[in-house]
Amino acid sequence: MTDNMRVEVYWNLHKHLFSVRALEGPNKGRVISHSHGISLTDVKFAVQPAGRERVRREGKKNVHAFVRGRIANSGFEDCRENFSDEKITYNPYIYDTFVNAKTKEPIFKTDCVEMDVMLEDGKRYPRILSFEK
């Protein structure tokens, strides 16, 4: 993974980690990493409606929600200088889109996100923080 590379990231239900899929370069369309954490800039939140409806219909989760952006190995400090961090969540049984966890307002894009794995009661779950410049 290189700095500024376009990727899409999703929560891997089997590995309990983030899967990172390349959106450009020789590995375009392939998972290039599994990670406990990643930072992205120029971020868009995407939910594929057909996948979401399939989850609701069948009661089984599938990969259909992504955080897309550019890898920020360096330069992420710009986002953190004057940031207002907001926790972002998505639950296909409740929401149609990613939402601000506090206000429940839909969110479709942001300047930067920091994604990491949290441990609570012995269970791993994803945490996504949104940062606006």
Task: Give the positions of each predicted feature.
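Short acidic DE-rich linear segments
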Residues: 129-133
